[in-house]
Amino acid sequence: MTTTTNTHTHAAALALGDDALVLSHRLGEWMGHAPVLEEEVALANIALDLLGQARILLSMAGDEDELAYLREERAFRNLQLVEQPNGDFAHTIARQLYFSTYQHLLYAQLAAREGPFAGLAAKAVKEVAYHRDHAEQWTLRLGDGTELSHERMQRACDALWRFTGEMFRPLHGLDLDGTGLDETDLDRTNPDGTDRDGTAPEGSSPAGTDLDSAWLESVKDVLGRAGLAVPDGPRTGAWSAGAGREGLHTESFGRMLAEMQHLHRSHPGASW
């Protein structure tokens, strides 16, 4: 493995690890506040699955504790979607549906081919299938429930839709469209996956087209069965597509990070 390839593997591991870490923390905020005890257990299990994934991925990029607790906000590479506040229960479910559908499709691809993420993906895809199915069942229940639950679920789907396009931006070290990037491609590309002349490298998809299409098909099917309308707004982040992957985050992320890192930073170098 060349230095360039290793660097890009680390970058991909960091981004995917940050996704899992941040969403795990968000779901953990529900502990003691979930609507029923059964859901308390379900959300805790999903959070723990994601935390386990985060530990493996962050360890591929460096020291897991240092990366989780000692980086500043701009150094995190997670999607803006996963950092969004829990809001009401419908918002949490919509966020989980969008992300778990993407994560399941991604890990299924990674598990099916050789590479540094194949082992993790083979295990994680089974966990994520449960996460996706759990979110799907709640989407159906809320969307096809009372007038109020339908309204809240639709509002949540609409509000989070603009963060979904970022999931399908190119990510160094990952092959999203099945064609792959060789080491020459990696050497001549920018962090956003484009050539240094601003174009997409030959043999790559600038927006993970196949993955995006499969995600849209799956989400549209769930929303349709739930009696919910597919949001029609733009699918870009708060400032620009790919903002979270570039270290640009929404306001609420800074507050979440301060809470998550408080204990570790309060006792630097302590042994636990």
Residue ranges: model-predicted function:
Residues 150-187, 192-272:
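Extended, helix-rich structural scaffolds rather than catalytic motifs
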Residues 2-12, 70-96, 145-146, 160-178, ...:
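Acidic/His metal-coordination segments adjacent to aromatic residues that form catalytic metal sites
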Residues 47-71, 135-139:
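Conserved alpha-helical segments that form or flank metal/cofactor-binding pockets of metalloenzymes
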Residues 81-137:
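Internal, conserved structured core segments that host functional sites
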Residues 9-13, 34-53, 92, 116-128:
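Alpha-helical scaffold segments that form or flank carboxylate-/histidine-based iron centers
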Residues 23-45, 102-118:
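Helix-loop segments that flank and shape redox-cofactor active sites
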Residues 14-19, 63-76, 225:
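Acidic, low-complexity proline/glycine-rich segments
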Residues 19-27, 53, 57, 99-106, ...:
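Amphipathic, well-ordered alpha-helical segments in soluble domains
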